[in-house]
Amino acid sequence: MNALTLPDIARQTTLSTLPLDWVGMQGIALPVQVAGQTVAAEADAGVSLDDPQARGIHMSRLYLALAGLEDGELDLPRLRGVLQRFLDSHADLSRRAYLRLRLAPLLRRPALVSPLSGWKRYPLVLDTRLENGTFQADLHLELTYSSTCPCSAALARQLIQERFAQDFAGQQPDHATILAWLGSSDGIVATPHSQRSSAQLRIGLAEDCAGLPLEELADLGECALGTAVQTAVKRADEQAFALANGQNLMFCEDAVRRLHRALRGYPQAREFSVRVVHAESLHAHDAVAESHWQRGAA
């Protein structure tokens, strides 16, 4: 008995002729290797459907090509290779291939002073595309940090000065008395407000960038801000964090400018955008600032 040939409906033509910008799948579960660890990722994979007569693409071919990302460290040549397989398997249908990966790798981060360390999550999105032999990759990275309001800090200092003048009116306190007063609840009568804040970085990676610069960009951004949220801490680390906040007072405008300056000096960026959000503890709304830069632009 002869085996039946299974029908391939995707090869049929359509009566409604129209090329499509993107056809594919989203939310595909996929393990990838990042920074020496296996990370659960979600992939959106697709190609353009440029043949207006074709009814559809071969989605299973895209799905199977993603297996090329499972073994070995995730890097840009590997991503480009997968996109090329997308196009090779749709040579008569498609000219453009797309792949987006959403993942949240963990990086071990040291405490500020003590020998402790802990894991921190870094939400990451990789957008890649291939068209006419040109490969482009954009990396989206979210950083979390603390921001202390400069205005609130000035107001708190003023209240401390007023309390000092009130408590020592007509007196000439000695050094020990002032030191004891500063260490009491009577001395520090007000503190500035601060909040957990986030920075969304989108970096268009240069053509000669091969590796995935997750840790490099995380270090660059956190160093520029100076107040990255911590993992495991002792009291000495908490005190160092309080000092860092006091020495890095920031409006959202200050934070975005710090990050912008740092990324301008990053050689693997062909362009970038920065968006910071300060989830105000004083207000019921957020403070937001954005900037953008493109290499070679005026």
UniProtKB/Swiss-Prot annotation:
Keyword Hydrolase: yes
Cross-referenced Pfam families: GCHY-1 (PF02649)
Catalysed transformations (reactions): GTP + H2O = 7,8-dihydroneopterin 3'-triphosphate + formate + H(+)
Enzyme superclass (EC): hydrolase
Pathway: Cofactor biosynthesis; 7,8-dihydroneopterin triphosphate biosynthesis; 7,8-dihydroneopterin triphosphate from GTP: step 1/1
Record-marked site positions (May be catalytically important): 149
Record-annotated membrane-spanning stretches: none
NCBIfam families xrefs: PRK13674.1-1
HAMAP family: GTP_cyclohydrol_B
PANTHER family the UniProt entry points to: GTP CYCLOHYDROLASE MPTA
General function of this protein: Converts GTP to 7,8-dihydroneopterin triphosphate.
Protein name stated in the entry: GTP cyclohydrolase FolE2
Biological source species: Pseudomonas paraeruginosa (strain DSM 24068 / PA7)
